[in-house]
Amino acid sequence: MAGPSRLPDKKQASISSFFTPRNTSPLVNLSQNASKKPPPAESKSSKSTSSRKRPEPQTDDSEDDVPRDAKRRRSNGPSAATDTEDAVASLKLSSSSRTERYALNSSRPSQDEQEKEEDVAERKKKEELHRKFVKKLGHPDSMFSYRQRDTESAAVEGEGEEGEDDEEEPAPKTTAKKKGAKTGKLTPMELQFLEIKRKHMDTLLIVEVGYKFRFFGEDARIAARELSIVCIPGKFRYDEHPSEAHLDRFASASIPVHRLPVHAKRLVAAGYKVGVVRQIETAALKKAGDNRNAPFVRKLTNVYTKGTYIDETGELDQPGETTGASSGGYLLCLTETPAKGMGTDEKVNVGIIAVQPATGDIIYDEFEDGFMRREIETRLLHISPCEFLIVGDLSKATDKLIQHLSGSSTNVFGDKSRVERVPKSKTMAAESYSNVTDFYAGKAKDSDERSAALLNKVLKLPEAVMICLSAMITHLTEYGLQHIFDLTKYFQSFSTRQHMLINGTTLESLEVYRNATDHSEKGSLLWALDKTHTRFGQRLLRKWIGRPLLDQQRLEERVSAVEELLNNQSTAKVDKLVNMLKSIKADLERSLIRIYYGKCTRPELLSTLQTLQKISFEYARVKSPADTGFSSTLLTSAIMTLPSISPMVTAHLSKINAEAARKDDKYAFFLEQHETEDISEHKLGIAAVEQDLDEHRSEAAKDLGKKVPVNYVTVAGIEYLIEVPNTDLKRVPASWAKISGTKKVSRFHTPTVLRLIAERDQHKESLASACDQAFSDLLSQIAGEYQPLRDAVSSLSTLDCLLSLSTVAALPGYTKPTFLPSSHPSFLSITEGRHPIAEHLLPNGYIPFTMSLGTLSSSASSPDPNPTSPSGKPALAQLITGPNMGGKSSYTRAVALLVLLAQIGSFVPATSMSLTLSDAIFTRMGARDNLFKGESTFMVEVSETAAILRQATPRSLVVLDELGRGTSTHDGRAIAGAVLEYVVRDVGCLMLFVTHYQDLAGVAEGLTVGEGEEKRRGVECVHMRFASNKSRTSMDDDAMEVDGDGDGQEGAGADKDEEEEITFLYDLAPGVAHRSYGLNVARLARIPRKVLEVAARKSSELEKEVRAKRIKGAMGLVGGVLYGGGAPGDQEEKLEQLVGLVEQL
């Protein structure tokens, strides 16, 4: 009778075991066994309910997490335990057997505390809930009545039960509630989150909870939308709003730990400010501390935005992710102050500083800008920032410009930019000076004279830049990136006059970085030139293209280096360079800056150091410039820097275990002789504990009455379990804690095993912390050598760019440009030049052109000593006419692009090219309005033209395309003529002037430059040739005109049966095209024939009317000239007018 009497006790325990936390302490188990009393008599219903349960939950098969085949093998004999261990071990992550012993096992019951985080009061509440639960299930109809509960209460309760294990279960909902009464309270962990969230309301928080990262409230809804993950409903607001009074949990969403970098990057790329809240104490150390019953301590450890996100997995904008050109990755700080009155013609003083955290580049500038904000636009288009930090208030014009350029995901930067604003006090200048001084003075205390020089350099910055620098230091301190400003070697002024000025309008008109169709890189000048092998080389090439050189010596050095690489193609020394660059898979520039910030991973550090070591070994024998095999100073100086980094790189690699670093194994990362004392101490501690555990097997065997030491087994990740057959349970001491079991065996931990496991866990967690600290110290040591390493990478990027330009130079038809001395008058000559982009895109190639502007001095050396223009008489400017779609704009773009190519040091697609250096390229092309500024098409035209007239110098190249098209014919013609005359006579720069106002030829003929013997023609009239074919019912031989000037059209006797077809020859010829043939373009655009017939008739009538007026005017002038009258000067003027009218006729 003794056996059946124990059954009710076991049945009752089976119910309570599901709701009472399992205690593994042997002392508690001992006290519980000692205080056992006979169970009270149970009712029949209770017995019937309990009789349907298994006799003991610890022996239920469902508690064993090992696969069924493993269980089956274990039950067959002692060898089954070994099979079970193999099955479990196969599920673990691969790591070396040598270091696996140091990794903390995350699935033991001793870490349940990390997943539960309940205080004593919550435990008592759970016990009360258990008592009520057993009471309600004490009759057969309990489940039926449970299902009849209010559906809303059941749904809310269901949401709570599906929460994580680290949160307490809410009390059951009652059907009768007072309106507006709270249904429960937040968990301690949620209260902890709420406290952090209220301090960072503008930040989307990702919270570490156990072995997941979770989002709460509105953050969860945002994460669910952006990351396509599930959001469990609950509270979305962070205040006690009555509308959510019936909810007792925050809405939540979760992601796995290993996916944090991926999801954080996606949220940052979407424009959010993301914060990561981590647990800063571990389970084993917490258990040994005083706050074992309190929630884990959590703090905001990382904050990321679009401009500050740096991680080990690469850039935010991966190649091919967007259709537009990616942004430059810069964080730009901007402030402005009014220069004069804030009126319609407002001017502002602007200060900017742009930081690229991923590479360490810093750009600053201070300038005055007019009401059109052209200067700001130019810098924004060059820098392409992904994030703005605005200090103080901006004027409406500046604010609208920033919104226009960055406010959508399809803007010219390629993606939506994030904007953050900070206030600007009246004493901001003094505060900024003090802040920057304190920042750099702190660096100077513990360093050498270099820090003092660094401080002096920074304090010389303009006031507006100083304000931006102070704001940026404060801003980046929040993200842990303020150390970037230690590297003042990489401070660059945007407006240094060592480079050609290319404003934003020119960048867009010439399609330098992206095409004008879909804003992608294909079809741009960068696309045509980019033959680089590395990412850092590609970034440098982009800078070269955007900032052509004005220093002729540097330019000659760069061209000579490209020429030498071209002449030595397929030689061993050039192939060695190419193969070395091709072998570089890592982005060394970004890897170095991540090392500097301490954000580099172990595999990335190994890859970076090994790559640098391989590069330095390639040129280890280079001791002098002669050893490089090249004569170019640019090539030799770049190669000479590579072997200099070999000692420091080799010294760091000698400390690292390459195999462990490749597997990201922190415990074996350092070779044993280079391990710190803390690492060695904790490894010895773990070994000692494991030795004690091994010796304890004999003691456990004695307790069980066995002579042979027991064997430990590992089941479901729980180590050091002692298996005892259920037939021998009588021998098990009462102090042993049962962990799990099956039908045939039970598994226990002895008090000694529990104590030793806890001690080992403390050693393991301390070891992990010591390994991380040692790795951080190594990164700090390498960061101290950042500048020589960065110089080596800069040399590699220079070599990559030069090789890219030499690859382009090897294309058919490319030639080396010739630069005339600075003392030479402005001059440009191109023989058989081609468009550098269009020739790659057009299936039939590009028809070359020959042109000259300016005057070639007799003393200048040139491969083309007598360059000729189409007319044989080069002038300062060209007036270009021709039919629509005849190639006028393409020709002017090609000329500007060839000048830009020559001044970045590239060969050019032409037979020959001679030029003086241009300090700027200005363009005014196309017709567009500017709605966000309230500017019409013509307003945009004249505003851009006015900016050009103010900034152009005699050394500039100006391209004006169809100026005056946005207004009436008379006004447009008058403005175009006045601008043409002003540029030629007053500015005196090289200019290409495209127009459909044929009568401007008369203005052009009267413009001259120079005095006396130096006097020469100011404007040359040229046109794009075409062939005109008139088809009639009976075709005659005179219906074809090939000269292209249109003068054969007037006397052809056009009638309604006549059709005219135009064939574009795309060739430059002297003279003026007196017709634009717009109807031909309309025919190509498939305008309805009836519309074309009416348009042709109207065009003919207008031409006849204008012709009649000109004849009448000419007759009047003839009479005035023949019969005299008036002053002698009037006679000469009338004669000139008569000549002009006759030419037009």
UniProtKB/Swiss-Prot annotation:
One GO CC annotation: nucleus
InterPro entries in UniProt: DNA_mismatch_repair_MutS-lik_N (IPR007695), DNA_mismatch_repair_MutS/MSH (IPR017261), DNA_mismatch_repair_MutS_C (IPR000432), DNA_mismatch_repair_MutS_clamp (IPR007861), DNA_mismatch_repair_MutS_core (IPR007696), DNA_mismatch_repair_MutS_N (IPR016151), DNA_mismatch_repair_MutS_sf (IPR036187), DNA_mmatch_repair_MutS_con_dom (IPR007860)
Keywords, in A-Z order: ATP-binding, DNA damage, DNA repair, DNA-binding, Nucleotide-binding, Nucleus
Biased amino acid composition, Basic and acidic residues: 121-131
Localization annotation: Nucleus
Chain sites annotated for binding ATP: G882, P883, N884, M885, G886, G887, K888, S889
Keyword match DNA repair: yes
Pfam name, any one: MutS_II
Region (Disordered): 1-183, 857-879, 1030-1056
Main location: nucleus
SMART domains: MUTSac, MUTSd
GO biological process: mismatch repair; mitotic recombination
Any one GO molecular function term: double-stranded DNA binding
Biased composition, class Acidic residues, residue ranges: 158-169, 1036-1048
Domain of life: Eukaryota
Compositional bias annotation for Polar residues: 13-33
Segments of this protein annotated with the region Mispair-binding domain: 183-307
UniProt cross-references to PANTHER family, sorted A to Z: DNA MISMATCH REPAIR PROTEIN MSH3, DNA MISMATCH REPAIR PROTEIN MUTS FAMILY MEMBER
Protein family per UniProt: Belongs to the DNA mismatch repair MutS family. MSH3 subfamily.
Role played: Component of the post-replicative DNA mismatch repair system (MMR). Heterodimerizes with msh-2 to form MutS beta, which binds to DNA mismatches thereby initiating DNA repair. Msh-3 provides substrate-binding and substrate specificity to the complex. When bound, the MutS beta heterodimer bends the DNA helix and shields approximately 20 base pairs. Acts mainly to repair insertion-deletion loops (IDLs) from 2 to 13 nucleotides in size, but can also repair base-base and single insertion-deletion mismatches that occur during replication.
Complex and partners: Heterodimer consisting of msh-2-msh-3 (MutS beta). Forms a ternary complex with MutL alpha (mlh-1-pms-1).
Xref: NCBIfam families: PRK05399.1
Name recorded for this polypeptide: DNA mismatch repair protein msh-3
The species this protein was found in: Neurospora crassa (strain ATCC 24698 / 74-OR23-1A / CBS 708.71 / DSM 1257 / FGSC 987)
Phylogenetic classification of the source organism: Eukaryota, Fungi, Dikarya, Ascomycota, Pezizomycotina
Gene: msh-3
